[in-house]
Amino acid sequence: MEPGLVGPGPYRATRLWNEIIELFRAGMPLRKHRCRFKSYERCFKASEAVDCLHELLGSNQNFGPEVTRSQTVKLLKKFLKNHVIEDIKGRWGKEDFQDDGHLYRFPPSSPLKPYPKKPSFGKEVIKFPDWDDPKAGTSQEHIPVKSIMMNSETWYKRHSIAIGEVPACKLVFRRELTQENIEEIWKSMTLARLQKVLGLDCLDEVIDTKLVNSKHIVQNAYNVNKQGIVTLEDKSKDLPHWILSAMKCLANWPICSDLKQPTYSGFERDVFKTIVDYFGQMKEPLLTFNFFDVFVSVLGLLQKHNEAIEALQISCLLLPPESRRKLQLLVRMMARISFNKDLPPLSESVRTRVLMVQAFSRCILCSKDEMDLDELLAAKLVSFLMDNYQEILSVPSSLKSSIEEHVVHVQRVQIKYAGADTDAAFPAPSFCHQISTDEFEYQRATGSQEPLAALLEEIATNKEISVKDKKKKLKQFQKSYPEVYRVRFPTPETEAVLFPEKSKQKPPLLMWALRKPFQPFHRTRSFRM
């Protein structure tokens, strides 16, 4: 079986789990083995399973070569617990798999997981705020937005069409947007952009949009320092000072401005262990349980580098500010430690980069329901984060500028000319909303019939075409759209009105004969009756 990239979408973790099982069952060699004077057909050693699965994961573009052998052993333990494999005596259900010579086999039953039935998020379409009717009690403070300035030359070009003939005009001021209005615009446009980047028809299966806090998005976009790190209004939610000092010490090693210089061997390892213990005891990962499916879906875009970075930029913008700040500081420290050649090794057996991924993956990404591929998925995401953290953890400039321009457009003063309708000259932005299936079918029927009825009326009242052509066109229309035709011409009498019969009276025979001159050698008709 040829492994393929599992793209973004709902149930991506379950799809990956099933794909790995299928690849493992198809690629694992089965042979005859002997154990304690007995022969067993179609089985394999534990060490052989580790070798095979490790190679499959390393060559699979959904996981990559950074998967370690220990992670492979942990996954095989999950396989044994979930009855993907069993020992030669048919035992399973425990995670007692070891990288040794014990014999295992595949059970005859299907080990694939069914796709979970997630509760519907209501498929509620995000509504843009009605800024004409602000709610009482909302703050009038507005977020700083980019002002659009026009010099005199630009203004002249825009308004120079027959300047001498421009009628009287007046300025129409839009009501100022409230803080809540602008926050809802940020939320709506951010989620719309995320949906487009992920290539999904709907975000309902990967995120509950009701759980997205519009205030968090705005705070993450504007409350940042010179380094792009989020600043918190509530300092009690920040990292403790001693953890910040420890992180700065390792990130800037050997320059430790906040701590005294180490006085004993292994000092840096103790500092690192302190940081690991602090982040390990958190009740919720930094990417939060609510957004687990979103980030797992983004993993399907890693082959498309630019799209993956933009999707992660937007997804990280949805985080609570305190989680985003901790993530920024932690990933920046991890990246600096990985590339710091002056820092002594923090482990005897594991490379520093691998150690960073193993130590902090779980506190960055994991699911609430303890899924079986959590560790591998988190390791893949954290590795990508470390390599591109400066771009991913910055505010997406294109999204920010487009939202700011939209807000300015809504707030901009409009010019209304005499006799003109302001809304017709400067149409306000219109937005879509979801409708029911019955309403859609009704709109599809009526919406297509109106232009057809107009076309039929045009044919019927057109005096420039001949009667023959008109009848031909009407007959073709009746054949193609009988329902529309029946509405306009319910009876033959209504159709006959278009073609009044002309009286065809023959001229008197005498007058006809007299009009022609008498010609010799031709018989003329007798005038006698």
From Swiss-Prot:
Residues 192-393 form the Rho-GAP domain. Residues 24-108 form the DEP domain. Pfam families: DEP, RhoGAP. The keyword Calcium does not apply. One of its GO terms (biological process) is intracellular signal transduction. It comes from the Eukaryota. This is DEP domain-containing protein 1B. It comes from Gallus gallus. The lineage of its organism: Eukaryota, Metazoa, Chordata, Craniata, Vertebrata. The gene is DEPDC1B.
